[in-house]
């Protein structure tokens, strides 16, 4: 039962991360698009509710509750007898069934249909200041610091500020290749 609880906690973490990554479209992170499985919110037309991640978190809560009941059942044993074994078995088997069904549903109706929100991801990549580290080998630390400070103060991208500072486009393309940063060994 403890191992099932660990699975439930892990699934909750994954489901909550997907809910946050899919939040939006304008006020959330909006890094991914979750499959639209039903009409959106009655108060917010166009919103995609993360129904499958929400189901997974509810199932996980039940499995965690079942684990607590099993634990209490285990406390009730006296010598070789424990009249709580039927309840413990029911909750254990119930948790197995719930997790199996929720995992299958999660994979088929949510995870398999996730799409990256490329426009948002590219905008985030262009606006991140942490990419200034990639400029160091090309223009040096001090100059990279000047560029990142100006980008932070002005709200502009590193590329824009660096271009205005006279760094050529070829150098910027080489330094600020986000796909290469994400997969430095080409994998």
Kindly label every feature range from the protein language model:
Residues 1-17, 89:
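Helix-rich catalytic cores of soluble enzyme domains
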Residues 16, 23-187:
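Catalytic-core signal marking the mid-to-C-terminal active-site face
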